[in-house]
Swiss-Prot record:
One of its GO terms (biological process) is phosphatidic acid biosynthetic process. The lineage of its organism: Bacteria, Pseudomonadati, Pseudomonadota, Alphaproteobacteria, Hyphomicrobiales. GO terms for molecular function: ATP binding; ATP-dependent diacylglycerol kinase activity; metal ion binding. This is Diacylglycerol kinase. PROSITE patterns: DAGK_PROKAR (PS01069).
Length: 137
């Protein structure tokens, strides 16, 4: 069995046959749920989740349009994805390079910057909808 047809899960000692068809779909969904559970363990993600809930409450108060809710949800999903990638980068760097290195620091800083960009985008958009579209109208 070649390397591209194997998947390793925690606790397994050898290669496992890759699932195909509908089993692959369920396996992929299981891995995604595992990633979501892992992401909930990150304090930064929990803070972002609270901020999203606050934005949704503010959108309700100002009477945001359906499009504005959809745009905010898309921005939040992007932020979740970037937070997941950033967490993966941090875990890989910590595993591969437990000592402090410039390359590891750069990788972590770049992942963090990507998250910051989306946090700012989410905040600016939410503020625009609430302040300019909501209270100014």
């Amino acid at each position: 069995m070649d390397a591209k047809n194997t998947t390793h899960r925690i606790g397994q000692t050898g290669p496992v046959e890759k699932q195909t068809g509908i089993r692959h779909l369920f396996a992929a969904a299981s891995y995604s749920l595992g990633g979501a559970k892992r992401l909930i363990g990150e304090a930064a993600f929990r803070h972002e989740l609270i901020a999203f809930a606050a934005a949704m409450i503010a959108f309700i108060i100002v009477g945001a349009t359906f499009f504005q809710y959809v745009a905010m949800a898309i921005l939040f999903l992007l932020m979740m994805a970037f937070e997941a990638i950033n967490t993966a980068i941090e875990e890989i760097v910590d595993r591969v390079s437990p000592e402090i290195s410039e390359m590891g620091k750069n990788a972590k800083d770049l992942g963090s910057f990507a998250c910051l960009c989306l946090i700012v985008a989410n905040g600016v958009y939410a503020a625009y909808v609430v302040i300019f579209d909501g209270f100014m109208n």
